[in-house]
Design a protein with these regions (language model features):
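Beta-strand elements of repeat-based all-beta scaffolds
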Residues: 2-412
Length: 412
């Protein structure tokens, strides 16, 4: 199918662009969409011609406020006519008639954003479509604050993280962030549930706080996000961890049960590549990259017990060629291929299913998956027991004739 603009013509007072997505090469049918534009060149109405279950056209009105924001009011789509292509100049009446007849909904056929009266133009309130939200005064409300040190609701802890060794990270709760150091967005949804999002000066989320009210008591469910000096995410501390933190105390990822069971921890090399990931309840997973920043080796905790590494070796174009398991002795914190570009090349190497590898030697390698590109010569080179004739091309009159060089750049 192709999207081909076939008309750009003025009609009435508005220009429009008609696009047809053909479903076959006869161009006898297809999906047609028309977009009308106002005098300023902004889309004002989109029509999906004849796409409803009764071949009616689906209309999508687009309106703007005084500052040309198209999301201040987002009208619901409606069906009208039979394969109609003309712009509906009285869409508000058509919209009201459609929803009143089909859904008994007579007002508020749109969602609405209410903006604050400031040059920042931030959203203050959001209403969903339908009159029920209005009658219940149920909207999503936003307010914009800053943190206050020591305040029960607007306080944010400050952390210091150090790496003691390859598998140990120490976390220290170093008091509170200074007042007005962080921006806070308070969100109250339609059910009066409140979420606070704290961001630093680099627009990074450092704390997400969900306030829970239960039998007159209030609980802050805090998720902290910790970054290093290079803005890399170092740790995520969910509520099960943050609830047990005490100001002035230090915690080790090896000895703290809550950190080991619930925290997300990350390690990086000198090039800011993530070389270590610790998920809740899991051992560290290590990653090793080559000079071209391609992931070559990875190892889970279970593989580490067996002395195994998982490898994925690319060709010169960066395409994965062979994947499997090996038993190399690798120190992920002293990368042996840091300054080496690893690549695969097609040969008649039967042990690696038709590939030879430069840049790294594989010990006791077991290839689990091999991928081939560009042509079908691998049938002669991969050393498998598959009969070559079973992989030969068979012409079929129901399909187009094969173009012999069409596989260039593709996986075969």
């Amino acid at each position: 199918p192709q999207n081909i603009p076939i008309e750009i013509l003025p009609i009435g007072r508005d220009n429009y662009i008609s696009t047809t997505n053909y479903l076959d090469n006869t161009r006898s049918g297809g999906r047609k969409e028309i977009t009308y534009y106002n005098g300023l060149g902004y889309p004002s109405q989109k029509i999906e011609v004849g796409t409803s279950n009764k071949n009616k056209s689906i209309y999508h009105p687009i309106v703007y406020d005084n500052l040309l924001r198209d999301d201040a009011k987002s009208y619901l789509p409606y069906a009208q006519g039979s394969n109609t292509e003309m712009k509906d100049w009285k869409f508000t009446e058509s919209l009201q008639d459609f929803y009143a007849f089909n859904y008994k909904e007579y007002t508020y056929h749109f969602s609405e954003k209410v903006y604050e009266d400031s040059p920042l133009g931030r959203v203050r309130e959001v209403y969903g479509p339908g009159s029920d939200w209005r009658s219940q005064k149920a909207s999503t409300k936003f307010s914009y604050l800053s943190n206050i040190a020591g305040n029960d609701t607007l306080n944010c802890l400050r952390f210091e993280m150090t790496e003691k060794d390859n598998q140990n990270m120490e976390l220290k709760v170093a008091g509170n962030c200074k007042s007005s150091e962080l921006s806070v967005t308070r969100t109250e949804n339609e059910d009066r549930q409140v979420t606070l999002e704290f961001k630093n000066k680099f627009d990074q989320v450092v704390l997400s706080r969900q306030i829970e009210h239960n039998n007159g008591s209030k609980t802050n469910n805090d998720t902290y996000y910790l970054y290093d000096e290079f803005d890399n995410l170092k740790a995520v501390l969910p509520p099960m961890v943050s609830a047990q933190l005490v100001s002035g105390s230090s915690y080790s990822s090896q000895t703290s049960a809550s950190l080991a069971q619930y925290a997300y921890l990350y390690k990086y090399d000198m090039r800011n590549r993530c070389i270590g990931t610790k998920l809740p309840g899991c051992s560290w997973e290590y990653k090793v990259y080559d000079l071209a920043d391609r992931l070559i080796f990875s190892q889970t905790g279970e593989q580490r017990k067996r002395g195994e590494w998982q490898f994925a070796l690319p060709d010169a174009m960066g395409r994965e060629c062979i994947m499997g398991i090996c038993k190399n002795a690798i120190d992920p914190f002293n990368n042996p291929i840091l300054n080496t570009c690893v690549k695969c090349e097609r040969t008649d190497n039967a042990s690696l299913l038709g590939y030879s590898v430069t840049g790294v030697a594989l010990n006791s390698a077991t290839v689990l998956t091999a991928k081939y590109y560009d042509d079908y010569q691998f049938k002669m080179q991969n050393g498998t027991l598959i009969s070559n004739s079973s992989l030969n091309y068979e012409a079929n009159s129901e399909f187009g004739e094969r173009y012999t060089t069409s596989s260039q750049g593709l996986q075969t």
